[in-house]
Amino acid sequence: MPSLDNTADEKPAIDPILLKVLDAVPFRLSIDDGIEAVRQRLRDLPRQPVHPELRVVDLAIDGPAGPIGTRIYWPPTCPDQAEAPVVLYFHGGGFVMGDLDTHDGTCRQHAVGADAIVVSVDYRLAPEHPYPAAIEDAWAATRWVAEHGRQVGADLGRIAVAGDSAGGTIAAVIAQRARDMGGPPIVFQLLWYPSTLWDQSLPSLAENADAPILDVKAIAAFSRWYAGEIDLHNPPAPMAPGRAENLADLPPAYIAVAGYDPLRDDGIRYGELLAAAGVPVEVHNAQTLVHGYVGYAGVVPAATEATNRGLVALRVVLHG
C-alpha cells in the first residue's frame, strides 16, 4: 500500500497522452467566474458514447426534502428475472456540481465493469444546499435500495457503494452510517480520489497546489460552500469520514488516488486508518494521472488501466 513517506519520491511525469488530451480539451475546476460557470463547463465537456446498449431508467424516489432523481443501469448480462449485485454511485463535483448526465458514462462503465446494477444518485448540491443535505439524500437512496431494490432486480446481499471525489467522500460516509444503523449491509466501498480528512497539513496539497483539473484554490472554495457554517478546522465525522472515532467493522475498501492530485495523500491516509482498524483495504496510486482520471478512461490508456483495476476489485467482491 502506498505510504505518505514516499509518495513524492521520484514521481514520474504526467502521462503524455493525458497532457495532449488536456491541451486539446482544456478543463479546470476554476471558481474565478462563479459557481454557475464552472457547473456549465462540466456539463459542456465533450463525452464519447459509453455502452449505449445498456438498459437505463430514470426514477424519482422519496427524499428528506422532496424527490431525489436517480438513474438505474442494468448490466448486459442481467436477464429480466435474475437478481444482480447493486452499486450505489455518488457522482463527484466538489459537492457543488455534477448530475446524472455528467457522470452517465462513468456509471455505464461501472455497470459493465462490475457486472452490476448501478443506481446513480442526484443528491442536492451546495452552496444552495450545504452539508448535510448531500449525505441525507445519499442515505435516503441507500434506504430505498434496501427497501425496494428487489423491484429492479437487485440482490440485497450484494450492495456496494462507490463514488468519485466528493462522491467518494459520500460513499465512505454511507458505509459508516450503514454500519452504525445496523444495515443495509454494504459489502464493498470503491472510493475514487476521495476527501475524507480536511487536513490542510497533508503534503500533496502543497506539492500539487496548481495541478491540472483541480487545484487547492478550488478545493478551498468547494469546501467552504459545502460546510456552510461548520468550522473546517474541526469538521464532524459525517462530513469528514476519516475523522470518525471508530473505523472498525467497515466493508472492504479500494481507494484510488492520483500522483498529481492535491487530494492524493488524503486517500492514502484514509487507507492507512482503515488498515489500522482491521479493515481490508487496497490503495492504488496512479502516479502519472490527475484528479478525475476515471473520466478519461477509454481515451487515455493509463486512465483506462487504472479505472479497470478498481472495477475489477469491485467485480471480484460482488461475484466472488
UniProtKB/Swiss-Prot annotation:
Organism listed in the record:
Mycobacterium tuberculosis (strain ATCC 25618 / H37Rv)
- What's this protein's name? Esterase LipI
Instruction: Check the UniProt entry and state the signal peptide residues, or none.
Output: none
EC class (word): hydrolase
Q: Which Gene3D superfamilies match?
A: alpha/beta hydrolase
Q: Which domain of life is it from?
A: Bacteria
Please list the coiled coil stretches: none
Q: What is the lineage of its organism?
A: Bacteria, Bacillati, Actinomycetota, Actinomycetes, Mycobacteriales
- How is the activity of this chain controlled? Inhibited by ionic detergents SDS (anions) and CTAB (cationic). Strongly inhibited by Zn(2+).
